Amino acid sequence: METRDVLIVGGGVIGCATAYELSQYKLKVTLVEKHHYLAQETSHANSGVIHTGIDPNPHKLTAKYNILGKKLWLNTYFKRLGFPRQKIRTLIVAFNEMEREQLEVLKQRGIANQINLEDIQMLSKEETLKLEPYVNPEIVAGLKIEGSWAIDPVLASKCLALAAQQNKVQICTNTEVTNISKQVDGTYLVWTNNETTPSFKVKKIIDAAGHYADYLAHLAKADDFEQTTRRGQYVVVTNQGELHLNSMVFMVPTIHGKGVIVSPMLDGNFLVGPTALDGVDKEATRYITKDAPCMLTKIGKHMVPSLNINNALISFAGSRPIDKATNDFIIRVAHNDPDFVILGGMKSPGLTAAPAIVREAVRLLNWKLTKKPNWNGKYNLPWI
C-alpha cells in the first residue's frame, strides 16, 4: 500500500483550502469527504460573508484569524481563483438606546481588530436612512462598515478543490472514515466505507471534519476535546423589484452570533437569518423547524418593512461547530499525537478565516516543505 503524506478529513471550505495550500508542495495529499458533493454541511448553509472583523473579541483566535484570513482572500485567493463574489458594505442597525451603545462597543472592537478608521462610521438615524431608505424608520442609529464581501461558499470550496486537484491532490468523495489506527512505524492506517478506496496509509492527518472533528480525534485516540452545535435557519425571499438594498443589514449581535441579517444575495434574492439554537444533535443540524420561516420573515420585515414575506422561496438550515471549552477556534496539534492536526470549533467567522487557518495547519505539520516548480494556483469556475 502506498503511503500518503497527508490525509485531510473533511471537504468543507476549511478542508478544501487546506488541500489547496498543500498542493503547492512536493507532497502526496488526499482529501476525503463523506458526502457525494463537497461543502454540504457548515460551508453549505451559512451567510456567505467575508467579514470585516467587527464582531470577534480581540483576544480570541476568531479575531486573529478573521483579520489574517480576510487579507488572504482579498490579496491572494481572489486574484488566483474565479468564483462568484461581490463587494458589499455591512450596516448594523440599532432600534433603541441600549443597542446604540452596543454599536459604539462594536466600533471600538472593529478598530482593535484593525478595521481602518475611514471604513467604519457611526451614523445618525437620518444618515442611516439616507444610506438605506428601505430600512425600518424606527431605527435610532446605524454602524456602517466598508470592506465586506458576499461569496458563494460552496462554489468557493469547489474552486479550491479543483485547483488542488489540478496540482495532483487526490479528492475522494463518498468516503467516510470508519477507523484510524496508529502503527508502530508512526504512520496511520485509516479505513473508510468506500470500496474503491477502503483504506489509506498516511504520515499525518489534518482533521477538518466540521461537526465531527471531535469524533474523529476520539476515533484516533489523539485528543478528547468536545464540540457542541449551534443550528442556524435561514429563509430566502425572492426579489420582484419592490426592494433595493446596497448593504448587508444586520441587527445588533448577541452572544449567540452576529445577529439576524437581511442581505442581497448574489442571485438577486434576499437572505434572512440565521436563528441560533444550541445543542442540536449532529445528525439534525440540517433540519428545518416549522416556526422558523415565519419567525425569520417577521424579523426580516421588522428590519426592512418592504420585504415581502409572501415571496419566501426556500428555507434551509446549517450549524456551526462550537468548542465547549473555549467557544473559540481550535488550531493545534492533538494533545496525544503531534502527527494529528486539529482544525475544530469552526464557527463564524470560519469562512473568512479559512485561508489563514489552513496556513497555520501547514505550519503545524512541522515539516520542511519543498515547493513544486510547476505549481499552478490559478483556477476559474465558469460563472457569470
Curated annotation (Swiss-Prot):
CC per GO annotation: cytoplasm; plasma membrane
One GO biological process term: glycerol catabolic process
Lipid moiety-binding region (S-diacylglycerol cysteine): C16
Pathway note: Polyol metabolism; glycerol degradation via glycerol kinase pathway; glycerone phosphate from sn-glycerol 3-phosphate (aerobic route): step 1/1
SUPFAM superfamilies: FAD-linked reductases, C-terminal domain, FAD/NAD(P)-binding domain
Plastid found in the keyword field: no
Keywords, comma-separated and alphabetical: Cell membrane, Cytoplasm, FAD, Flavoprotein, Glycerol metabolism, Lipoprotein, Membrane, Oxidoreductase, Palmitate, Signal, Virulence
Active site: H51
GO molecular function annotation: oxidoreductase activity
Chain sites annotated for binding sn-glycerol 3-phosphate: S47, H51, K258, R320, S348
Free-text disruption phenotype from the record: Cells lacking this gene do not grow at all in glycerol-containing medium, and exhibit a significantly reduced formation of hydrogen peroxide and a severely reduced cytotoxicity.
UniProt cofactor(s): FAD
EC number of the protein: 1.1.3.21
Membrane topology: Lipid-anchor
Gene3D superfamilies referenced in this protein's UniProt entry, alphabetically: D-Amino Acid Oxidase, subunit A, domain 2 (3.30.9.10), FAD/NAD(P)-binding domain (3.50.50.60)
Description of how the protein assembles with itself and partners: Monomer.
Role: Catalyzes the oxidation of glycerol 3-phosphate to dihydroxyacetone phosphate (DHAP), with a reduction of O2 to H2O2. The formation of hydrogen peroxide by this enzyme is crucial for cytotoxic effects of M.pneumoniae on host cells. Is involved in the metabolism of glycerol and is essential for glycerol utilization; glycerol is one of the few carbon sources that can be utilized by M.pneumoniae for growth. To a lesser extent, is also able to use glyceraldehyde 3-phosphate (GAP), an intermediate in the glycolysis pathway, as a substrate (but the structure of the product has not been elucidated).
Stored NCBIfam families: glycerol3P_ox_II
Protein name per its UniProtKB record: Glycerol 3-phosphate oxidase
Organism: Mycoplasma pneumoniae (strain ATCC 29342 / M129 / Subtype 1) (Mycoplasmoides pneumoniae)
